[in-house]
Amino acid sequence: MAKQDSVQLMTKGSIAKQIIGYAIPIFIGYLFQQLYNTVDALIVGNFLGQNALAAVTSVGSLIFLFVGFFNGFATGASVIIANAIGAQDEDRTKKAVYTTATFGIILGLIMTVSGYVLTDQMLMWMGSPQEVFGLSSTYLKIYFLGGFSLVLYNMLVGIIRAGGDAKHPLYYLIVSSILNVILDVVFITVFKMGVAGAAWATIISEFASMFLCAVQLAREESILHISWLHLTLDFENLKQICIYGLPTGLQGCVIDFANVMIQSYINSFGAAAIAGIGAYSKVEGFIFLPEISFSMALTTFVSQNEGAGQKERSRKGILFGLAASLLMIECMGVLIFLFAPTFISFFNQNLEVIEIGVARAKICAFFYILLGFSHVVSSVLRGLGRPVMPMVVMLVCWCAVRVVVLMIVGQSIHSLYLTHWLYPITWGLSSIVYVFDLRKYKLFTPRV
């Protein structure tokens, strides 16, 4: 079996070319991932009906609650590894790589066990409607059985991307996406497995992508090589991964906690509301792709260049990535605004479902630039070694404000429009805080 060296330094060469070259494979990869999530919802909604669609889409916030927390450690590990690579510290890099892989196995087992055991309790806490409770429970329990693969996959991708390689994860996502769609069709339309079929299709495809990442790292000839029979855990590196990863994980966790609360509120409006918001969330996922791609590119770019002491190059990269990301996400927002009814109708033909989804689109579409700004800046701060600031901002603006407003205003105003407006308002609050924080960083002043 051929060996390979996929490490690519981002400390020299064209800044724009490197950031775009790194971001494009991530964008395409997440596009495929979003497409298979969308196809999953399309198949469920059209073949299994409104309740099945509501069951699958309504648990998305719970899944993100778990995945967002554990992904924080993958981001933290990626920052540590990228910084060590930029500093050309081979010993520190190797220890961080092995610690990340070993820790990923541990975290994967934790997610699988805790998610499976807590499924029904979490659904009751969310106030899942009786007509979708059983379907949601079935889907979630099967999904969490594959949680190990998902967490380990994200940790391994963090290692690969820290070395500047975004292409191989793209290939694995494409394979996983195609496999997921094929299995969806077979399990749901041929074997009549219902929502269980959708869940099994997802976890099998996630295992495939995790396995491909593991094989790549075993074949590496670079400092990213992993010998899977000789895994070790370096506690100093584990400490650093937790220092960087825990704030990021908590950031994702608190955001998703707020989203779970909002989903609980939405659940009180019945299956049509759940399906309408759920369908739009699938459409909305495409809007996030540009800022996710550039955010991840900037985290690695900044980490490597800060590790190499190239602060001015880091600053220029931040400015370019921020401008490109905001331009793209707002273009996507305009597109969604214009064609929301068509996009929503792909998932369900029920007029009430379409109307609810379109209402969310019309309110949020022109505010996505604020969301993009907040996400990109938080990723930059993590790359700069400041993961606590984004956590605090998101905890206050995206969690506390949303939950408090929902608990106070939601008691007197029982309207879905409250949930529609909560998002752009809190995106604006976080953007204001980040503007003041960037002034201290002197983003528009050359650094030496």
Regions found by a protein language model. Name each.
Residues 12, 16-35, 39, 62-69, ...:
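Residue-level signal for short hydrophobic patches within transmembrane helices
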Residues 1-23, 81-148, 190-246, 302-367, ...:
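Short alpha-helical transmembrane segments in multi-pass integral membrane proteins
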